[in-house]
Amino acid sequence: MQCQILCFIFKMLTRKISGHILTIGCEYRHPKGGVAQVMYNYEKYVFPVFNCIVNSGGTNNVAKLLKAISGYLLMAIHLTTDSHLRIVHIHTSSYNSFKRSAYFVRLAKAFGRKVVLHIHGGDFKKYYVTNPKWIASVLNRCDMIVTLSESWKNYFQTITNGPQIRIVENIVAPPQEGCQL
């Protein structure tokens, strides 16, 4: 009984809060990777209101570019027309994913929104040394960085000087029965 009450309260709070969050990330409706699976599970099990704009996906470079451009334009429209959106939660990785996400970080900050950058990239340390000043400047524009483990949190604390850093482990399987959100 207590679990049901807690789930009900969490669902109410989450419905109210989740309507203020705009998520940016890869195509996730038919997940083919870790980030897509996390986003799919967020929509299905965690957030009652899942405002999401897809910024990557496609089978060739032209399709990928068009997806990024259309995602950027859609985000600008949402931020212009929906004053309820307070937080932009951007899922990213390394290399091209991070470069693409940097544009979305800049746009969100231009509209005065809080930015949560959720970094999934296992190769981020290798990527960081390719352009540390620019990458650090993007990271430091964010209000919060979400990492997947304590070791990643410690790493990001050494290369940033501003954003809060939090750990949120990936959810890759549906929650157990009984306290489903």
Tell me the role of every PLM-derived stretch.
Residues T92-S97, R113-T130, M144:
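A short, histidine- and acid-enriched strand-loop-helix "catalytic/donor-clamping" loop
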Residues G71, I87-F111:
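An aromatic- and histidine-rich active-site surface loop
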Residues F111-K114, P163:
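A short helix->loop->beta-strand "cap" motif at the edges of active sites that frequently abuts
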Residues L66-L79:
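Glycine-rich, highly charged phosphate/nucleotide-binding loops
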